């Protein structure tokens, strides 16, 4: 009479990975997330590897984690995986300051983001 098992948050042919506290703004992170959205995972890995954006290496780590979760935890075939969703959200904003002229103080906002990547196994028709 133990506690009931939590239902899966994703479908049977899906897996996801989530990264929190990425030190970039959500607007900049969404540019890289849009780069891989809807692509096959091998093409997405190639795009992220050669991207010039600084945050693309962190997005690549999250994508590789989602692929590993799909393979090891859910038994999905890696060759048939597609990035079904890649979205980001706002996390905390560190507020810092800088002394300015005439005794004033300028606000500097240092935003953090979070990223969720969901991969889905599709058939040969993808």
Swiss-Prot record:
Transmembrane segments: none annotated. The keyword Oxidoreductase does not apply. It comes from the Bacteria. InterPro entries: Ribosomal_uL22 (IPR001063), Ribosomal_uL22_bac/chlpt-type (IPR005727), Ribosomal_uL22_bac/org-type (IPR047867), Ribosomal_uL22_sf (IPR036394). Keywords: Ribonucleoprotein, Ribosomal protein, RNA-binding, rRNA-binding. One of its GO terms (molecular function) is structural constituent of ribosome. It holds the Pfam family Ribosomal_L22. Disulfide bonds: none annotated. The keyword RNA-binding applies. GO terms for biological process: translation. One of its GO terms (cellular component) is cytosolic large ribosomal subunit. Belongs to the universal ribosomal protein uL22 family. Part of the 50S ribosomal subunit. This protein binds specifically to 23S rRNA; its binding is stimulated by other ribosomal proteins, e.g. L4, L17, and L20. It is important during the early stages of 50S assembly. It makes multiple contacts with different domains of the 23S rRNA in the assembled 50S subunit and ribosome. The globular domain of the protein is located near the polypeptide exit tunnel on the outside of the subunit, while an extended beta-hairpin is found that lines the wall of the exit tunnel in the center of the 70S ribosome. This is Large ribosomal subunit protein uL22. It comes from Cereibacter sphaeroides (strain ATCC 17023 / DSM 158 / JCM 6121 / CCUG 31486 / LMG 2827 / NBRC 12203 / NCIMB 8253 / ATH 2.4.1.) (Rhodobacter sphaeroides). The lineage of its organism: Bacteria, Pseudomonadati, Pseudomonadota, Alphaproteobacteria, Rhodobacterales.
């Amino acid at each position: 009479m133990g506690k009931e098992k939590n239902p899966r948050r994703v479908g049977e042919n899906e897996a996801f990975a989530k990264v929190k506290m990425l030190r970039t703004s959500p607007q900049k992170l969404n540019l890289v997330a849009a780069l891989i959205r809807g692509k096959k995972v091998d093409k997405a890995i190639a795009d992220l590897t050669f991207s010039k954006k600084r945050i693309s290496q962190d997005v690549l780590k999250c994508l590789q984690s989602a692929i590993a979760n799909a393979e090891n935890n859910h038994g999905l075939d890696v060759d048939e995986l597609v990035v079904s969703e890649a979205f980001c959200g706002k996390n905390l904003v560190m507020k810092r300051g800088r002394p300015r002229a005439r005794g004033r103080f300028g606000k500097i906002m240092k935003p953090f983001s979070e990223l969720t990547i969901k991969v889905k196994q599709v058939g040969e028709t993808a």
